Swiss-Prot record:
Compositional bias ranges of the Basic residues kind: 330-340
Protein name per its UniProtKB record: Conidiation-specific protein 13
Species annotation: Neurospora crassa (strain ATCC 24698 / 74-OR23-1A / CBS 708.71 / DSM 1257 / FGSC 987)
Gene designation: con-13
Keyword tags: Conidiation, Differentiation, Sporulation
Annotated GO biological process: conidium formation; sporulation resulting in formation of a cellular spore
Domain of life: Eukaryota
Region called Disordered, residue ranges: 313-340
Amino acid sequence: MPQAHFFALLLAAVVPAVLADGPPESMGEKFSGLNVLDGNGGLQSLTPTPYTISQWPWGTVPKLCYDTSVNNKYCNPYDLEVYDVRYTDCPIPTTVCRCKNSPMAIDTIAQRVGQLPVKARQYNGYVSSFAGDMCSAYSDSFNNYFFGDCGNSESVFFHELSHNLDRHVAGASINDWYSLSQDWKDTVAKDTCVADHYSKASWLEAYAQVGVMAGYDATVQSIYTQNVGCMVNQVKKVVGQLNSVWRKQPGQMCDRYWIKDTTVCMGPDAEASGHCQASKADVAAESGGVNPVLPDGQQKKHDALVKELQRHAEAAAGISSGKPAADRKTKGKKGTKFRV
């Protein structure tokens, strides 16, 4: 959830225990924010993979999208739009859950996601988009969630996906976020600076910011053109871990995916009107997917950490219990009520 204009807001809050540890405040900061890697022919200018979009009939949604929307008051479930975005480099569609009051149009979301190289993109399952005062986002290490208008911030999409890659590529051998390891802390300690001020929020954020830099290195030009000598050990480490998934190659296709979630009814109004027929993303060879489930002990730690990432993103987007995302701007489908 990196955006320079809300770093102060995020870091002014008390950082919860799980994420309290991070690079020391005394370290230098290479950039004022990684949005500097978006412009001037940067990440924002990457050519998106061609795609087609098909919208689900109103009435049913993936359970993950329903639970996220209802439990957090991000969206009236009747206002959820569900799309399958099928990119030409992957037969498995990316399923997007968009609240009707999201400032990002589905085409914008599809383009931004399509700019992510397929070998990295395949480590993300669902993409969700909700209202918010500012662009902010979080990752649960399997799926990415966006608030506000991130349409001009491709670096945010790279950042959130970097959280997924931190766990499932860099941390694959330990089945955990690599950024929580002593090796990452030791690597950072060898340098005199981190990517930016936001990198000091936690070891996870420090890694994800370098993940963006590694993505830039693989897709735009050498990150060393940015004079990153003060953090060369971090850059070498993350580029070495992620270059194979960030770098685009002709003819690349996806070769993995997360198994799609079950489908649920939006609510009694949809059921009463006969719009709750079973529906699911059109997925070939479902049995070949990877089930995004962790052992109980790891799941509890994972969920606690993700909850903190989520709350940081909410604060940055101006979302709270008194100002839920579901109440922003338009209400969505006329004549329905928020009944669950």
